[in-house]
């Protein structure tokens, strides 16, 4: 559970770090499952280290990880922040390569479709060795909108990853009235004012997906997995957005995953008899997002 001040911290700044929420024994077991899932996806081939390797549905693929999703230490804070009828959105296990430029995971602040990412790093990460950097308060208007030019750097990256096009970047440059290659806000991407959320194995980061975040200087193959939750969609616009995110997930699987599946969600997870998991996937089943 979050204290009232911890909840206020999250709502105001857009993130909170729960230090050593998971024990060393738990982290050892989780790390073993992480390696097993990603090795299985690569069919036991070595990680080439050329591009990011991401496995969608990561937390759904092993009993230990599914148990973590409904663990009080994860579930109860999410319930406090999103409400008792919150839904499951997705998860992924990642081996990262290079920097991750400034971006937000959600670009729809006006729809009030609140989403939270829970991130767990399996290795120590610092300011200049790949930890998550965040811009506090950037999940709230008007600050969120004022930072929109920052997406330029990330849009260049996703072109290289095969997830966007130069035409889309050109359109963004035109909309923002910026010049390609110029210093946004007068600084390099890595010098944008921010807070580095340095992390040790066992720490867990909760952050609003509208929050601007990045990572710089990390080693090739740094390991991190996420669990993503959302408020229960109550408007047609929110449901449409949920469906759109489902389609984007399918596109990302084709680019970053080795063993491609048409299914976004694991069968055992989607049709679990566990009350908490049943509750958070009920909307997905209702909408046919399997």
Where are these regions (language model features)?
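Short, charged/polar surface micro-motifs in flexible loops or helix N-caps
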Residues: 84, 96, 125-127, 204, ...
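Double-stranded beta-helix
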Residues: 129-212
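Short edge-strand/loop segments of extracellular domains
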Residues: 96, 135-142, 229-234
